[in-house]
Amino acid sequence: LLRNDAPDLVISGINRGPNLGGACIYSGTVNAAMEASMAGRPALAASLRSFTSSDYSVAAEITLRVAEWALKNPLPRGALYNLNVPDLPMDRILGVRGAQKLAPMFLSDARYESFQSEYKHTFYFLTDGENPHAFPEDSDDVLNERGWATVSALSWDISLRQGMPPIDVKL
């Protein structure tokens, strides 16, 4: 499609609802950006932390500013930037901050929350429940909850680096 005129940056989103922490694994928005990055294109996934807001103007403005920054600060092939914008007016957003840690997803505490679209479709989302104390203070979820637009660098490589026991399987 774009063989001779590839984009300088692929922006996936703006997603309705956050893509923070372990939820990134399930996100079509994040994974569309991941596909672009694996094809060698710089990519940015953008999400608004609201399932009900219809005003994307603040998220769009912040996405544009982060996109301009991302073009000047490229990541290696196979990596992407993941932006999450709080659902706040611009004058209440504290700024844009890098989040080195993704909030963990504790499936033992998880629950499903439902959301009904304007077309009366019901969607279910796996959430971490009501346990923000379990998240590190500098994690994407905590920073975003406090009013920061957060940017995380993600990679497709989710391999466990340490802790896998030696394979001893007889055939």
What residue spans do the PLM features occupy?
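A short, flexible beta-alpha/helix-coil linker loop
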Residues: R16-N19, S50-F51
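Electrostatically charged, flexible surface regions
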Residues: V58-L171
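Glycine-rich phosphate-binding loop signature in dinucleotide/nucleotide-binding domains
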Residues: L1-P7
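Glycine/threonine-rich flexible loop motifs
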Residues: P18-S27
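Glycine-rich phosphate/pyrophosphate-binding loops
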Residues: S37-A59
